[in-house]
Structure formats: structure tokens, C-alpha cells
Amino acid sequence: MAGSTLGTLFKITTWGESHGKGVGVVIDGCPAGLSLCEADIQKFLDRRKPGQSRYATPRKEDDAVEILSGVFEGKTTGTPISLVVFNRNQQSKDYSEIASYYRPGHADYTFDQKYGFRDYRGGGRSSGRETIGRVAAGAVAVKILNELGITFMTYTKSIGPIAVSSGHFDFSEVTKNPLYMPDAEAAENAENYLDACMTELNSSGGIVECIIKGMPAGIGDPVFEKLNANLAKAVMSIGAVKGFEIGDGFDVAKATGKNNNDAFVLGEDGRIAKATNHAGGILGGMSDGSDIILRAAIKPTPSIAATQRTVNQSGEEISVNIKGRHDPIIVPRAVVVVESMAAITIVDALFSNMNARMDMLKKFYS
């Protein structure tokens, strides 16, 4: 199976299945000398861990990470970092009926068509548990970026029709509600909306927004290695993501040049800055020094208890009610996944940028 590796100089390879022995990641290209311990990674994994609210799957997993290689005496060694999380609470019997039919909205049918075989227990490689490896690698990437003064603000921007209000935005609220929304009023309304969805045996989607602060200008490459293109690839590779935006995104189609262009101005420090940020921090595929603002549209959880139509492997049309332990919404748990994929992409772009200019090479090797 190809397609499990991302990156060029900072490279990750995820592995494992939802109901296998474990899941994990191998990270290639992490510099030596970074302070790193399991607690650093665990903080990130705990943000996506199941069973933490009534809006997450009741599957109880500690998701405890173990560092198998690449770290010695609390520092990275420059060799591949291997991280593993063992699965502890599989209930594969919940999926025995699924072996005979294709779940609407899942990858069952496409896996079967490609490989002639599929792991029906929780979706195998297409399960949300695959993102554990991404988040573990993301924790390492964010630690590297924090050393360079680059930080993240990532949160749930909307759930169904309920969106965060700019007038009520308070990032400190994110950790105070189970939906990771920076707006207490919107979070309360979204909880009521989700409760209604659950009563109707239904699920909901939403939008995750990620703001990257402290980015220097000039990171990314023109043409086929644009920073926005690579961010889109990384975020769109998350199984539940169906849409991606940078800056004003699809709203630019309704704009004019006058109100879409960001005027350049001199900042208080005398450096070039922008008066607005419709571009979302990227121009010509390269960072412009402003905040990078991206959004990911997350689809509703496809496993719902309501009756759905499908076809079984005998070619018969049937009606199904999917059983098992499923999230009524995965948006809150996807927040850290989106952040992780963005961080991994940014680190790779920063490393690639080191050979862009002779003066940078001379400074490094002199």
C-alpha cells in the first residue's frame, strides 16, 4: 500500500490499523538536539483522545505514546524517531455485520475495488485512529516551530449552522467547552444543536480554523511546491476533510480587486507589512510574513444509527442501521489533527528554504 509517507526533508510515515495491535509513526529528518519526551507528545494526543465528552466515541483508549527510537537522554539524536500507541479497547465484534455490506460515506467500497480486500473492523487504515501518528508527529513539528517563535491558534470555527462570532471571540474559551469553540455562546448553541442531532440518530460536520503566527516571509516555493498547495495536500489527506481554504478562500470569487488586494504599508518597526490579510498570509505560494489563516471543512460522521440504504457484497440493495461506538461529530477531535498537518508542512518548507540563497548557505557553513 503506497501513500503513507508525507514530506521531503521532514518526512513522516504513519502505520497501523484501528483494530490492529497499534498505530504509530516514523519521523525522518528531525534535527538532533531537540528536547523531547513522551509527555510533550502525550499533550497533543490527549487533545484527540476518544471518550472525553458525550460528543466523542465512548471507546476508551489511553492513547499512551511510547518513544521507540531517535531520542536519548531527553534529546533527539538526528536518527529516525519511531512512536507507537498500542490499541487497548478494540471491540471487533461490533463490526461483524459490516463485513457483508458497504457503509455509506465510508471507504469500504473503494478499498474493496482497489485491493480486492478490506479490513472492515473500524475501517482499518481509513479509520480516524490513523491520525494518531499524524498528531504524534505534529507534536514534534510544533515543538520545532515553537523554538523558532512560530505558534498556532487552532479551534472549531463552526458546527453545522452554528458559527463563532468575531464579536465574542475569546481563545481562552477553547479549553472550557468540549467542542473547542472560542465563543461561549456559540458553544452552548452548538451543544444544543448536537443534542438534537443525536436524538435523531444523526451526526454533524463543521469547520476547523488554524492561524499560524510568527511565520517569516519567503517560505515556500513557486509553481509546484507552493506553500498553500502543500498545506492543502496535507490537510486534505485527513480522511474527514472535504474542503480547504486559505485566507478569504471561496469568498474571493465574489470580491473585486479593490477590496481583495492587501495594501502594503510600513509597520511601526519600519518593516513592510500588510494593512489587511485577505490572502491569508501567502502570496505566490510563499509566506508573506502575515498570519497564515487556513480552514478545513469536516464532513459529518458517516457512521450513524439512522436507517440508510446501501448494497451488500452479493449485489443486493439493503437497509442498514450501523452499530458500534461512533462520534456524533468529529470536528473537536480533528482540531489537533489539522494543526499537526499544518505544522508538519511548515517544518518541511522551512527546512527546504535553507538552500534558497547563497548568503544563507554561507552563514550556515561559515
Please state what every model-predicted region is.
Residues M1-R59:
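N-terminal, positively charged regions that mediate nucleic acid binding
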Residues K11, S303-S366:
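Internal helix-turn-beta structural module
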Residues K11-T14, D119-E130, A217-D221, N277-I282, ...:
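A short glycine/serine-rich beta->alpha loop
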Residues W15, K21, L201-S204, V208-E317:
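Glycine-rich anion/phosphate-binding loop at the beta-strand->alpha-helix junction
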Residues K21-G33, G128-I150, E225, A229-K233, ...:
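Alpha-helical support elements that line or immediately flank enzyme active sites
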Residues F44-P104, D108:
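Glycine-rich, N-terminal phosphate-binding loop and its surrounding beta-alpha-beta segment
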Residues A99-G124, Q308-H326:
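Short acidic, glycine/tyrosine-flanked loop/strand segments centered on an H-E-D-like triad
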Residues Q113-V223:
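Glycine-rich, mobile lid/loop segments that gate access to catalytic sites or pores
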